[in-house]
Regions:
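A detector of single, family-specific signature residues
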Residues: 1-176
Length: 176
């Protein structure tokens, strides 16, 4: 199994290289931290990241990820295309001539963008998005469903901010 395979590799590394998992893990975590900082630094050098950073709960790393996945924005004609690219559009289940029912998320497109938006939604519902989160929860929607709705909302806001080159304004929550 996997555990046995890992044990064999760990013994090999320890025996021939003097390396143990205890020494590798902190080194890998440190390298990951440095890479994240470099990514944010690289994307911060452009002006577009500041617009996404202005959204409450969106971290610089998530903002950089969202920006990297959306660029160039002019390849999309409509916001619905961007939502579909993120895989945040509902799938339609249809059979024969019967009208379709909306099901779960389609999950087409960029998995990385979808995950970044979901994490951003998870961070934002503690801030300016809390009233919106509570309103959807009071309608009987599950926590995950509301986070998916907030993900779409964040995507719409992010695209509007990038196109209009403006900082986040809580009034956007009522307009999008």
């Amino acid at each position: 199994g996997v555990a046995g395979s890992l044990a064999i590799h760990e013994r090999y590394l320890k025996q021939y290289r003097g390396i143990t998992a205890a020494t590798v893990t902190p080194q890998m975590l440190a390298k990951c931290k440095v890479l994240k900082e470099r990514i944010v630094q690289q994307w911060s050098s452009g002006n577009d990241l500041k617009y996404l950073d202005s959204i409450p709960g969106v971290t610089p790393f998530l903002g950089a990820t969202i920006l990297a996945e959306l660029q160039p924005l002019d390849r999309f004609q409509k916001i619905d295309q961007i939502i579909a690219f993120a895989g945040l559009d509902p799938s339609v289940k249809q059979t024969g001539g019967k009208p379709g029912n909306h099901g779960a998320l389609s999950k087409r497109g960029s998995r990385t963008l979808r995950q970044a938006l979901y994490l951003a939604a998870f961070g934002t519902f503690h801030h300016a998005f809390r009233p919106l989160y509570d309103a959807y929860r009071n309608r009987g929607l599950a926590h995950t469903e509301v986070l998916c709705i907030l993900s779409r909302k964040i995507l719409r806001i992010a695209v509007a901010l990038l196109k209009k080159r403006r900082m986040f304004d809580p009034a956007y929550l009522d307009r999008t």
